[in-house]
């Protein structure tokens, strides 16, 4: 039975779920619209609304909490990122900084007068290969 189970479960480990949701949340903030499956979108909506609520506060503590929730690692590099950084490619840092700045500067100020419901889920046709329910999750215009 699924009584009192609120978490998203798709047969992955909890660490994999956390990383997947953090990456999807970064993509949603960066592009403001992503295409995914319906169960993932419903779970992502919960996290996105919490991040917008943090962005509306616009304090240093809120920024630090957002960095932690998005799993942004400014000081820890993987071996691939270290090779890119030695070559002068700092795009790894720039994208993460753009995501945080966009969250707090654009999205936080856009939804100041709104108390919740910052995202919308639009259902699409099922995927051809496995008949998965596809949808688009996006931030509202204002």
UniProtKB/Swiss-Prot annotation:
Show the GO cellular component annotation of the record.
cytosolic large ribosomal subunit
Q: Name one GO molecular function term.
A: structural constituent of ribosome
Q: Name one GO biological process term.
A: translation
Judging by the UniProt lineage, the source's domain of life is Bacteria
Keywords, alphabetical: Ribonucleoprotein, Ribosomal protein
Pfam families to which the protein is assigned, alphabetical: Ribosomal_L17
Q: Where are the transmembrane segments?
A: none
- Keyword Iron set for record: no
Question: Mind telling me which InterPro entries this protein's record contains?
Answer: Ribosomal_bL17, Ribosomal_bL17_CS, Ribosomal_bL17_sf
Indicate yes or no for the key word ATP-binding.
Answer: no
Q: Return the similarity comment.
A: Belongs to the bacterial ribosomal protein bL17 family.
Subunit structure, interactors included: Part of the 50S ribosomal subunit. Contacts protein L32.
What HAMAP family does its record include? Ribosomal_bL17
What's the name of the protein? Large ribosomal subunit protein bL17
């Amino acid at each position: 039975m699924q009584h009192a189970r609120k978490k998203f479960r798709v047969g992955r480990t909890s660490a994999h779920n956390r990383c997947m949701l953090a990456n999807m949340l970064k993509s949603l903030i960066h592009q403001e619209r992503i295409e995914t499956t319906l169960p993932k979108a419903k779970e992502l909506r919960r996290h996105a609304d919490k991040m917008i609520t943090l962005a509306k506060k616009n304090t240093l503590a809120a920024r630090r909490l957002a960095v932690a929730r998005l799993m942004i690692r400014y000081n820890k590099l993987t071996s691939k990122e270290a090779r890119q950084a030695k070559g002068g490619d700092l795009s790894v840092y720039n994208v993460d900084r753009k995501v945080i700045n966009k969250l707090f500067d654009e999205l936080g100020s856009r939804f100041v007068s709104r108390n919740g419901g910052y995202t919308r889920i639009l259902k699409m046709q099922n995927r051809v290969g496995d008949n998965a329910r596809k949808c688009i999750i996006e931030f509202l215009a204002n």
